[in-house]
């Protein structure tokens, strides 16, 4: 009986520790990792509740200049961001929104097969240990630290400062813009509605959440 109690206690301790790592923003608060767009947003806005939020993909990152705006919205633009990302952030309580939510929508933010950034924390499975989920970032830092230590160097990793979201600069002529739109129309505009069903369903959940 004591062995069973001990095993249960160990399992619970591991589960609680993993949960703490998941939600304590360990990587967000460290300068030794390259942060993704969500982590950069968290780093700039450590407050528990974001009163006004502007969500979208890279279009929002580039178009809404938070530091030059007086509107007070948190720029939650994410590279490869889709509506299901926003819903998972809300549902899994990775963000808390106060009074306003603005969503920048286009066909890519609603496209179910659009590739995503696998390091976003809401992609972590419930049964997946945090250290394993972040293995691609932890492993190189640990092995590099050991190599430096063996060579008599300081094992401290390189600091990645400062870190900003990538902004896509550039301009197109009318002809180039027209050609680009034609390409997008050929690739996306005639897709069946099933290709957007998951994100549309997530949008409905977000609307219901806001209405509540």
Where do the PLM segments sit?
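Hydrophobic membrane-insertion alpha-helices, especially the h-region
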Residues: 2-25
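Short, flexible loop segments at the rims of nucleotide/cofactor-binding pockets, characterized by
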Residues: 28-35, 76-81, 193-196
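Secreted/periplasmic serine-hydrolase-like ester/acetyl group-modifying domain
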Residues: 105, 114-209
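Alpha-helical transmembrane signal-anchor/signal-peptide segments
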Residues: 23-46
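Membrane-embedded segments
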Residues: 54, 59-138
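A generic local structural motif
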Residues: 37-42, 87-89, 203-204
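Extended hydrophobic/aromatic segments used for targeting, binding, or gating
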Residues: 13, 207-212
